[in-house]
Each structure stands twice: as C-alpha cells, then as structure tokens.
Amino acid sequence: MFDLIKKVPQKCLDLMERITSSGGQVFLVGGCVRDLLLKQSSKDWDLVTNLPYSELYNLFPDGHYHGKSFSVFTVDGIEIATFRGKGSQSTSLEDDLRHRDFTINAMAIDINGELWDFFGGQKDLQNRVVRFVANPYDRVQEDYCRMLRGCRFVGYLSGQLEEESAKAIVHFSDAIQVVAKERLRIELLKMMALSDLESAVLCMQRSNLLKWILPSLNECQNRIVSAYVTNKDLFIHSLDTARAIGQHKPLLRLAALLHECTPFTASENRPDERHKHVETVRELLTGMRFSHDELYYVIETIEKLDFSLYGLSTIVDLRRFLSKLGMPLEDFLDVYHAHLLASDATEAEFMAYDRMVLDLRAIRQENSAFSLKDLKINGGVLKKMGMKPGPVFSDILDACLEKVLQEPSKNEEHYLMHYARKLYHQHRA
C-alpha cells in the first residue's frame, strides 16, 4: 500500500508529517482514500487526527475553522477534523469511521501508506457494492441525505446496494422529504454527471426515492407513447435520452430526464398538458433552489424539444428558430440528437436532423442579427427620430428583426430607420 501514499499531494503529506512529529495520529480518510484505491484523481484531501483543535491551531496558526455540524480546521485547502464519534469527539479512528456513510468511504491511510479498513470497504469497492457502515438503519437516521448518496454511489461504481442497506433506504424513503432542498440539488447534479447515470436513476426507482426527488419522471413509468417506433414507456425514453448526452453536461441531462411529458411526437395537440408539465418542472426546480439561469435553461430545453424538424423547412424558418433559441446551439443539437436516438427515429428523421445541423451552423456563422440587440437601431434611435415612446416601439423593432431574418443584408441603420419610420406612420394613420 506504500504506493498509495506516493499519489498524495506534497502539501498534504507535509501536514501529516508535522502532526506526526508533534506526537499526534493523523490519517487520510473518506473519498480520497476510495479514489486512491480506484486509481482515480481526487479533488478533496481530508485528514482526521486525535489532536484537539487547540493544538491544531498552535501547529497551524494560519488555519481557520468552519463547518456547521462539527468544527473542521482548514490549512491550505486541506480539511483536518478531530476524531468524532456518536454525537461528540472520539479518541478512536475506528469509532470515527464507524459513523461515516458507506464502507467504501470509511477507510483511512496513515503516513506510512498503511490502509486501515475496519468494515470491509476495500472488498466492497472491488465487488462494486454500496453498503452502509455497521447498522444501516442507524447510518440512515444520522443523515437522510445518505439515501440519495447511496444511489449516486451505485452509479459511480456501476454497482449495487447491499441487501440490508437497500432495505433501510426503502424503509426510510419518505424521510428524504426533510432533507434541505439545496442538498438534494447538489446530489442530483452530481448524479447527472455520472458515466453510469442509468444505474443511479434505477436505484432511486427501486428505493422509492424517485417519487420524492423527481415525481414527474416517476409518474412516467408504464406510460406508453404509441408514436414511438418501439412503443417504449416514457420513463425509459427519458432515461435513454439523458444517457445519450455527455456526462459533462449534467444540467442538460436533467432537462432530458424531465422532458418526458412534452415530446413533440406525443403532445403536439395537447398544449394545455404541455404548459402544465412545464409549470410542474418549474415548481420542482424552484423548490430545490436551482438558480434562475439553471431554471431557465431546463425549461428552454424542454420547450425547444417540443417541435417537429419538418417545421423548419426554409432558411428563414431556421433564422427565426435561432432568434428564439435561449440556450447554446450545440446543447440544443446534443439533446435533440439524444431525443431522436431514444425515440428510435427513422433514417429519414436522422437525415433531416443532419441537414438541420449543417444549416443552423452555417446560419450561425452569418454576420446577421438574431435578436433585437443585434439590430443596427434601437429604441434610442427611434426617439431621436422624433417618435413617441410606447408599446409601438416594441412592435416596430420586432418587425425590423423579422425583416432582417428574411433578408440579413437589410440590417443597416439607414435602411432600418427608413423602414421604422414607414411602420410608425402606418401605426398613426
């Protein structure tokens, strides 16, 4: 195991050496140990020690405390905690590890590179098993968010929950409602960034968590959409769509999971239902404390999936579409392609998509206007022309944009001023 310690950042080893030299015990713990064993890079390096915080402060006067549930001492970005047990500090590494969430996260490495594994974490890691440490019912009750974390780690390992751990989550699944919504948001976005998103989502489904975390997705189970070639249910369709998107776009994956009630093939004649679904998603994400920009992005994605490729038959149609697209073009292309894959689209549909991609990218390269801010005139120009401000300004500028979308060369100040004056006089007539 000595090779493991060679992968630890030098600044972390220096802290461990200083604590050891002062007579203290110190260990690397948690996710960084798990990542070392998996031969993966780690972002966070956490230490535990038997030294009280007063001694840590004497050793590292530049450090500072933080943390709500218990104090954590941070030095140069490295977190150092004192051994903690049930409800208080402890003098035992084993007791500290006993109250961590999963066996795969309850291992430690000392400065000599020796692995301390009291609960079989290494074996579980090798077998891709997610198991609560010791009594699963106790671990869950210490922090109900651990249930969602358990499903995330199932996806992280492409593994499975240990049987008793799975039973504990099902038993307490309703309690996920008391977890702070901000924490659920963080866990959900981490889950969306997994390479094996499917295993994590299916774990939520089997554990009765999905109905509380993503209720609209849960309700899509066994709902068949006859317009799909394979007649798959909306739950599987949504999951397949999300899986087909790169893991580096977690928010786009989330939008794909939540688009299920508004695919154009199923709902083009049900505008009321589409609107209701969008509002349900808005309410869900607002409750989870998603930011305004995140919320807008997800809603925009859902709404933009609700159209037919065949509705964009001309270059002007494509320009209009780009003018109303409130998300990066490449993200839209990614999610729409994923949607087609999940729908088992026909060869003709994929050919139409490929043509649309080429046309949209070519149009995007045009030195043209796609929004009001791109026009060579604005409300200030209209005022200088002697026009009286009012709702008519919006109508005039919208008409100017439509003119430019049809003829990009018309985005010229002199022409647009002349065109705007004509529209203004027509309005007053």
PLM region spans:
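Catalytic cores of the polymerase beta-like nucleotidyltransferase superfamily
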Residues: M1-A429
